[in-house]
Regions:
Chain B
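Central hydrophobic cores of alpha-helical transmembrane segments in multi-pass inner-membrane proteins
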Residues: 11-26, 40-53, 94-106, 124-126, ...
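Helix-coil boundary and interhelical linker segments in multi-pass alpha-helical membrane proteins
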Residues: 1-4, 129-135, 268-282, 322-342, ...
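Juxtamembrane/interfacial segments at transmembrane-helix boundaries in multi-pass membrane proteins
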Residues: 57-79, 179-237, 242, 267-285, ...
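Alpha-helical multi-pass transmembrane bundles of energy-transducing inner-membrane proteins
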Residues: 30-32, 116-123, 128-215, 300-313, ...
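Predominantly late transmembrane helices and immediately cytosolic-facing juxtamembrane segments
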Residues: 234, 348-352, 418-451
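C-terminal ends of transmembrane helices
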Residues: 21-32, 99-111, 153-162, 231-245, ...
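Transmembrane helix-loop-helix hairpins at membrane boundaries of multipass inner-membrane proteins
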Residues: 1-9, 23-119, 194-210, 510-540
Length: 703, 545
């Protein structure tokens, strides 16, 4: 277990090698081999660590490998503390489960991608695996980080990889836009998250999860009011809504489907988008102390689940259906955390990782077969061409719809039971959502795999379409829908098995007591949610429903799911014309739903346009006013200089010149006398003598 | 280690570029490659001789290190008094590194009046280093002014379209600020004489001065004008986008990476410790100007169509962050502020270099002229991506460390300020990613871009140190932060009389007089010594008095 830091490091090294050398030098198989080997090694290490964890008495292990931010003194609420963050990793049941999900599904998706991305040119192919490895590195950091800040490293890092992978086909504007949107919307969430982290430090003087939980455990539960823990939790939850695509920050996830499908499966279904749920579960003790925020979390989760499901009902892009389904299922997980069922949330996170990764990879297989067509209206009857994809996707759909004994049933049922216990209204929303889920998933199955084939015929379809895809680089002609190669179907099989059996670790008490099996995952995970809660037993947030109620709830949710499936069957297989009828009868509602409630338009008109306009406005202000003042000062100086110049030239200098002029002009008179003629001078001399003599005589004899 | 100070290391670092510049005077202006080799050689040499600052710096002492002290103008008490602490040592290393990079980046970009160009760049190096090492306020001021001249010519001669306007604007702005700052310096100088009867510009003595609040207030304002123009803080920033846009690439790099740090350096070295009470009084004003700078700079950056001007406005935003951390007046905030000064040098310097690369190829900075460069210049796009991420503070890269420390540092002081400032992380991502998308992503629509060459080996060499530093500081900032401990303690001890540093167990706990600190009084013991004992760096605080 001391080597858990190698778990993230291996894919990190893979990314470094492929990124620094591979993009330039490696062939496709070498690059894919390195990437897969890195993930395989990481998976083995994870299994090993997990086995050790199971065997250990004390199921918590922290490994500190280095100092990151050395201690610096800083005031906190309770005096001067030390701001210090080590590179520390923490393995406990929750993170143990997560590393298995990330490395396991990550490994499968690496394998799948090595075939799926084969059409890419070599450079792009290697670049893809670099990003994918880098993503796993950051995701494992996120999961294993033992403090808020180390988690935040992974948190932001997966955001970067998401950005890069969504925009993988960056020459498409829509892809580049979607990547940017994902990053910026996530940053809005991070804004809340970092403030939450700052407040955590200010309140507790540490950022370590365990220390925070221990400190929080000794603080009163903020039942009546909205204290500092509530504020922390609310801010953290803002971060979670960004990363896990909840209202109001869910808008980036459907757009993220611009990325290659394996990316959608790994990042935007199985792992990264669950980070918010993971983070909330990681801080279970904190959230337990903020019941008001818990309620907000539950409401946001339930409403998001419902809203996303309604949008999912009408989407025709196969990946968009799955995207909204993901948003909706994440809503379920938040609903679970909100009602205090943290292990149910983690359980659903795990089963969802299996069946949603499966569904995405299956859809990728279909898209691949259809030469990059994603519109279900142009598919149909695909089960004839690709039986493996059909069977495995069918399994996934049953699992997500919540039909026993597939995995989704157990996890979703647990959430529903807890919700029922806490709040009947939210339970109602969740059940309606469950029905919709079953409907839109089977609508997807029926539209894709049943009915008439509606796609282009392949005799003449060599290159006539592709407005949806990345087929500029396809070197080969399309020969009609076909089953995918083994490298792609094998992961489907593995995940399908997982989607069937993963639920057995969380058999509810009503059934478990009946057949003599306990709820393994609940007991396994519980210590992670009560860490630091001294004296509190396992049952701090147990289910107190009678078996009869539990049975009834289960039966009801299965019934609702069955109704959803039946409705889909009737509308899309038995009488497909009815679907069109619905569309015309409810045109208004349909338009609102296909336009996703116009939320994107709203955000665009307010936040995006507002920011851009204020940017432009301020720039004008900068040029006109701020710089205008500077230039104005410059102009004034010059004007003053000009005035001085004028004054100088005409007044000051004028005076000088005037004096000069006077002398010049005055001297004119005298100049006239300077004739240069001796006789004139002689006359003048005589005249002068005469004057002097006269004056002398007069003065002498008169005076 | 302790014998290193007997060797005039700092003078060597400072004058190496100057020697290069003088040598260039004797080279014929027609042998341009010889000139380039000499300039590059001396720049790299300058960096190499500055490396001992990293390795030999004693992190355990709050004394000034590598001190040299000679008489300069005895009649007014001015001395050639130089020395460093961790803070200035790091900035000197930044200056010598970025100087070498800037000079290397000019190899093919500058083809006219090559000789004068390199002479000015090398002179600028000496000026910058001189300002960072000066412990005499007059000496500092001289270097501060000396820096102006080469930069003025670099912009005015080798700049682009509006170069004269920009050069004069840069010059006048800084000059006005520094003239007023000089008044402030003189006020401190005469006050010191009035109190002690000694005429001196010795900064270490000024650090112990307890000036009356009114005087502090006015002097703070005077210093503020000088330094805030240089940072630049809103609303004194408008010279910056013009200067950056019109300066040659190397000029922009130096300007962003080092010259702007003169302002923040000035605040931390002079305003805060000399004027602690006034500093505290001005905190809300400076903080709000910083916050306005952060948001305003980011929003205006978003509206830019000129690539370089966008980076320039992002600089305004980032420097607002630096100022904010500083005026948190918490150790974490000030540490973050200093770390972020270095980070800003790396990432913004890198971004200007990157603009320079494509500008040299296309001679346009219009963002709309580009697009799809990822396909043509993949290595360039990769470097640009790392620099972008560093600039927007992605964890594992350097910018994150600075931002998180600054925001955490300000958060414990005032949560509202922190919340406003943190919007910068959203806006920063928005304008940088949009820039990235417009230049790197999409298809190559402009035929002029089709044949662009990717990074050459020389260009790649200019980026390599920056990339390494970005990752290093991001993953393991400890060596940097450790070197700053005592510098931060020194400032904190002045601005917060109850502050007790972590690593000084024996430090004074007792209440100091307003603005005073016994810790500093101890340092005083040395600085008032007869000068020559300062030539030898004393690792132990000796009673040399």
């Amino acid at each position: 277990m001391d080597l858990i830091w190698l778990i993230p490091l291996l894919p990190g090294l893979g990314a470094a090698v492929n990124g620094l050398l591979g993009i330039r030098y490696f062939s496709k198989p070498v690059a894919a081999g390195i990437a897969c080997a890195a993930m395989g090694g990481s998976l083995l290490l994870s299994l090993f660590a997990f086995a050790q964890l199971l065997g250990a008495e004390h199921r918590e292990h922290i490994v500190t490998i280095a100092n990151w931010i050395p201690p610096i003194p800083l005031e906190t609420v309770s005096g001067v503390g030390q701001f210090e963050v080590p590179w520390a990793f923490r393995l406990d049941p929750l993170s143990g489960m997560m590393i298995l999900i990330v490395t396991g599904i990550g490994f499968l998706i690496h394998l799948y991608s090595s075939s799926y991305m084969d059409h890419e040119p070599r450079g792009g192919y290697v670049r893809f695996f670099t990003y994918l490895n880098l993503f796993c590195f950051f995701m494992l950091m996120l999961v294993l980080g033992s403090s808020f800040l180390v988690m935040f490293v992974g948190w932001e890092g997966v955001g970067l990889c998401s950005y890069l992978l969504i925009g993988f086909w960056y020459h498409k504007k829509s892809a580049a836009d979607a990547g940017k949107k994902a990053f910026i919307v996530n940053r809005i969430g991070d804004f809340g998250f970092v403030l939450g982290v700052f407040l955590v430090f200010f309140t507790f003087g540490t950022l370590d999860f365990r220390e925070v939980a221990e400190a929080a455990a000794h603080m009163p539960v903020e039942a009546g009011g909205f204290g500092v823990i509530s504020l922390i939790c609310l801010l953290l939850f803002v971060g979670a809504t960004g990363k896990s695509a909840q209202i109001p920050l869910y808008v980036w996830l459907p757009d993220a489907m611009e990325g290659p499908t394996p990316v959608s499966a790994l990042i935007h279904a199985a792992t990264m988008v669950t980070a918010g749920v993971y983070m909330v579960a990681r801080n279970a003790v904190l959230f337990e102390h903020a019941p008001n925020v818990m309620f907000i979390v539950a409401v946001v989760g339930a409403v998001t689940a419902l809203v996303a499901a309604t949008i999912g009902l009408v989407q025709t892009d196969i990946k968009k259906v799955l995207a909204y389904s993901t948003v909706s299922q994440l809503g379920y997980m938040f609903l679970a955390t909100g009602v205090g069922a943290f292990s149910a949330a983690a359980f659903h996170l795990m089963t969802h990782a299996f069946f949603k990764a499966l569904l995405f990879l299956g859809s990728g297989s279909v898209i691949h077969a259809m030469n990059d067509e994603q519109d279900m209206q142009k598919m149909g009857n695909m089960r004839r061409y690709m039986p493996v994809t059909f069977i495995t996707m069918f399994v996934g759909s049953i699992a997500i719809a919540g039909i026993p004994p597939f995995s989704g049933f157990f996890s979703k049922d647990e959430i529903l039971a807890y919700t029922f216990q806490e709040n009947k209204v939210l339970w109602g929303l969740a059940v309606i959502t469950a029905g919709m889920t079953a409907f839109y998933m089977f609508r997807l199955i029926f539209m894709t795999f049943f009915g008439e084939y509606r796609g282009p015929s392949w005799e003449k379809a060599d290159d006539s379409h592709g407005d949806h895809g990345h087929d500029d680089n396809h070197g080969h002609a399309w020969h009609g829908p076909h089953e995918s190669p083994r490298l792609m179907t094998t992961p489907l099989w593995v995940l399908a098995v997982g989607a069937i059996v993963a639920g057995f670790v969380g058999i509810p008490a009503a059934i478990g007591d009946f057949i003599g099996v306990g709820n393994a995952i609940h007991h396994f995970l519980e210590p992670s949610f009560t860490a630091g809660l001294a004296g509190h037993g396992d049952e701090h947030a147990g289910l107190h429903l009678s078996h009869a109620v539990e049975w009834a709830l289960m039966a009801f949710s299965v019934l609702v799911a069955a109704c959803g499936i039946g409705l889909a069957y009737v509308n899309y297989v038995r009488r497909p014309e009815r679907a069109a009828q619905w569309k015309t009868n409810w045109a208004g509602a349909h338009r609102v739903l296909t336009n996703k409630y116009y939320v994107d338009e709203l955000y665009d008109a307010t936040a995006v346009k507002g920011t851009m306009a204020s940017g432009r406005g301020l720039w004008t202000f900068d040029k006109g006013v701020v710089d205008g003042a500077v230039n104005g000062a410059g102009w004034l100086t010059r004007a003053a200089a000009w005035v001085s110049h004028v004054l100088d030239k005409y007044i000051v200098d004028g005076l000088v010149n005037l004096v000069g002029w006077i002398f010049a002009e005055g001297s004119y008179v005298f100049r006239r006398g300077q004739t240069g003629l001796i006789q004139n001078y002689a006359v003048a001399t005589l005249f002068g003598v005469f004057v002097f003599v006269t004056v002398y005589v007069v003065a002498r004899y008169v005076g | 280690m302790s014998n290193t100070a007997e060797f005039p290391l700092l003078s060597l670092i400072m004058f190496t570029p100057l020697v290069g510049a003088v040598l260039l005077l004797f080279v014929s202006k027609h042998s341009e490659n010889t000139i380039r080799w000499i300039a590059n050689g001396f720049a790299v040499l300058g960096f190499l001789v500055s490396l001992p600052l990293w390795f030999w710096l004693d992190q355990s002492t709050s004394d000034w290190q590598f001190v040299e002290r000679l008489s300069w103008i005895p009649s007014i008490g001015a001395e050639y008094f130089i020395g460093v602490d961790g803070f200035s040592a790091l900035l000197i290393l930044l200056a010598t590194l970025m100087g070498s990079i800037a000079i290397l980046s000019s190899w093919t970009a500058i083809t006219e009046r090559v000789k004068e160009y390199y002479i000015f760049l090398l002179l600028l190096q000496t000026g910058m280093i001189g300002a960072f090492v000066s412990l005499d306020f007059l000496l500092f001021f001289v270097f501060w002014e000396v820096m102006l001249v080469p930069m003025y010519f670099l912009i005015g001669i080798w700049g682009s379209t509006n170069r004269l306007y920009s050069a004069i604007k840069f010059f006048l702005f800084t000059l006005v600020g520094s003239v007023i700052m000089l008044l402030g310096i003189l006020a401190v100088y005469f006050y010191h004489h009035e109190v002690t009867g000694v005429y001196t510009f010795d900064i270490t003595r000024f650090h112990e001065l307890n000036m009356p609040f009114d005087l502090q207030w006015w002097v703070f304002l005077a210093f503020f004008l000088g330094f805030a123009v240089k940072v630049p803080m809103f609303p004194f920033h408008t010279w910056l986008p013009d200067a950056h846009t019109d300066a040659p690439t190397a000029g922009s790099v130096i300007l962003a990476a080092v010259l702007l740090k003169m302002g923040t350096y000035g605040f931390i070295r002079f305003s805060l410790p000399i004027l602690p009470e006034a500093t505290q009084a001005f905190v809300p004003w400076v903080v709000w100007l910083s916050i306005i700078g952060i948001i305003y700079g980011a929003l205006v950056a978003m509206a830019q169509r000129d690539w370089k001007r966008l980076v320039a406005y992002s600089s305004v935003s980032h420097m607002g962050m630096v100022m904010l951390g500083m005026f948190a007046l918490t150790p974490v905030g000030i540490t973050g502020s200093i770390v972020q000064q270095i980070n800003h040098g790396i990432s913004t310097g890198g971004l200007f270099l990157l603009v320079g690369v494509v500008y040299e190829r296309r001679h346009t900075r219009e963002i709309s002229e580009y697009g799809g460069l990822s396909k043509i210049m993949p290595a360039y796009a990769a470097v640009f991506l790392v620099m972008t991420m560093s600039s927007i503070g992605l964890p594992t890269l350097n910018g994150f460390i600075g931002e998180i420390l600054i925001l955490q540092g300000i958060f414990v002081v005032n949560k509202v300020w922190a919340a406003f400032a943190a919007t910068g992380i959203v806006l920063g991502a928005a304008y940088m990613l949009w820039l990235y998308q417009r230049t790197m992503f999409g298809t190559v629509n402009n035929p002029k871009n089709e044949g662009l060459a990717d990074l050459s080996l020389r260009e790649f060499a200019t980026f390599t140190p920056l990339l390494i530093l970005a990752v290093w500081i991001g993953l393991y900032p400890k060596p940097f932060i450790d070197r700053l401990d005592t510098s931060v303690d020194r400032v904190m001890a002045r601005v917060n009389s109850t502050y007790a540093p972590l690593n000084a167990g024996a430090a004074d706990e007792d209440e100091a007089e307003p603005g005073g600190g016994d810790l500093l009084a101890q340092i005083d013991g040395e600085t008032t010594g007869d000068g020559f004992d300062r030539l030898v760096r004393l690792p132990v605080r000796g009673g040399s008095r």
